[in-house]
Amino acid sequence: MADMRTRWILGFVGSATVAIVAVAAAQGRSEAPAPGGDSIQPDDLQADVSFLAGDKMQGRRTGTPGNRQAAEFIASRFGRSGLTAVGVNGSYFQPFDLMTATLGESNRIEVSGVPAVDLTFGTTYYPDPTSGTGTASGDVVFAGFGIRADALDHNDYRSSFALDGKVALILNHEPGEFDAGSPFDGAIASEHARVVRKVLAAQTAGATAVLIAPDMHNHEGPRGTTRPRRSVWPERPPRRPRYQVAGWVRDVAIPVVQISGDLAARMVENAGLTMRELAGAGAERVGGIAAVPLPEQHVELTTSVHRRFHPNRNVVGLIEGEDPVLRDEWILITAHYDHEGADGTRVFNGADDNASGVAGLIEIAEAYRLAGLDGLRPRRSVLLAAWNSEEQGLLGAWSYTANPIHPLGQTVAVLNMDMIGRDEEIPDGGGARFYGLTAQTAASNRNAVNVLGYSRSPDLKRAAERANRVTGLTLRFRYDNNASNLLRRSDQWPFLHEGVPALFIHTGLHPDYHTERDRPDTVNYGKMARVVQMVHALSWNLAQSPTRPAYLSR
């Protein structure tokens, strides 16, 4: 409540907004807020967003002073609300490393039966950024998409011969890429298509090196490399570093080289086969391909990739449960605090994306503190986590799932808030940012919030519907299997990938998304307060429930 803590005073505008949301909430509310939930008010949220998304923070990009300052601010607010510090050395920080790669000088490839003049660096081949540095050689084996997915009973390395000492030729992407019924998440690329996962599977199977060719079965067009060399290895250092999770790449010790479709076809044809035959009927086979040796195709290659490691951190704080048994089961409430940084005179403030979600975390922490003052505590423990490096590929959340503070098997649910302060507005013909989304106006979404992850846990969907009785929002359960791939574009995805029930709370994209126009004065703080109250109520209900939500694999 206002008189129980220090808060920034925003004057008449904040007071008026409080009045508006109070009326709106009263109109749609059929249940009282969860304990402490009445403290979640627009003026406090506005103060938090205004600080996090102010120009002085310079867009909070990973690795910048503004990003580090944001982390310190969140930690200080967690401390003020009495959260238990469960990070490293009794702090609120969970450290993790990211990696960037630069191209070295010595990179070459020699393929038997292919003249050296045809092997042009940057056009015919180049090292992948995941590559180890070193020299390797071996006979070539075609191994389909290079996927081993035991849960799907798919293994492209099942074979009667050993891969030891061989060079694996694999395709990028995955089987059934445009098949809605594919076990690999239908027509949306799954985690099994990630290059580093394929490389580690090949390395474990004994490969000395990996060659990655374009998937010509599913993708017609130029037969060059998967991506132009300049898009992977720009001639000048990129303005914004390209990060990877260090824990993934650190284990890669073998050379990894992207090659052109033409080179792959030449190698296969020299062995008396055809690439389309292998890529189609072979690689697309259910359960994986029986790896195919390519007779008389021998490769020698050298790669030089310099790795640099960068320390980063998530911010974590715990509300300890009071039940002696259930306290070992955790609810996670999460939001990412990084954004896109600054570009010359432009600052990408990231007010909605995602100062809004972080402000929600901060005010939920305070709501739990106030409930505790009234003697009300959750039965299960609740971890509040602010992830870093979401904009670089959910890297903070991936790092957590690789090294969780608490076992994922004892994580009951994850509630992720990302962009919770606007009305969804999809312009007609809006371009790549809005791919797969139907044109709609902001006015049609005034009271709406998207909830994703529902298809993986009907129990969690029902819990969200119950929690919404507190606020009367319009919950839209859509986009789980949409071509926009939204379900996989925020920090709930690493948890869903690990089988943990998770919801993505998201008021939707809009024309200011990832532009310098995403500023604090564009956020609807009244609506945002209701969204945060709903998430708080949902977390409280889950923490008190005698049962935990089930997870359904796709």
Where are these regions (language model features)?
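N-terminal hydrophobic or amphipathic helices/low-complexity stretches enriched
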Residues: 26-85, 263-266, 328-330, 552
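Second-shell loop/turn segments in exported
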Residues: 31-39, 55-65, 97, 107, ...
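Soluble metallo-hydrolase cores and metallopeptidase-like ectodomains found primarily
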Residues: 33, 112, 120-160, 247-350, ...
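Noncatalytic luminal/extracellular "stalk/propeptide" segments of secretory-pathway proteins
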Residues: 58-181, 295-296, 305-307, 311-314
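Metal-dependent peptidase/peptidase-like ectodomains
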Residues: 116-120, 132-133, 244-277, 387-504
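Extracellular/luminal Protease-associated
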Residues: 119-248, 252-255, 320, 346-348, ...
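Short helix-loop-beta-strand segments that form the rim/entrance of peptidase-like active sites
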Residues: 365-393, 417, 422
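His/Asp/Glu-rich mid-to-C-terminal helical/loop segments that flank catalytic regions of hydrolases
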Residues: 366, 506, 510-554
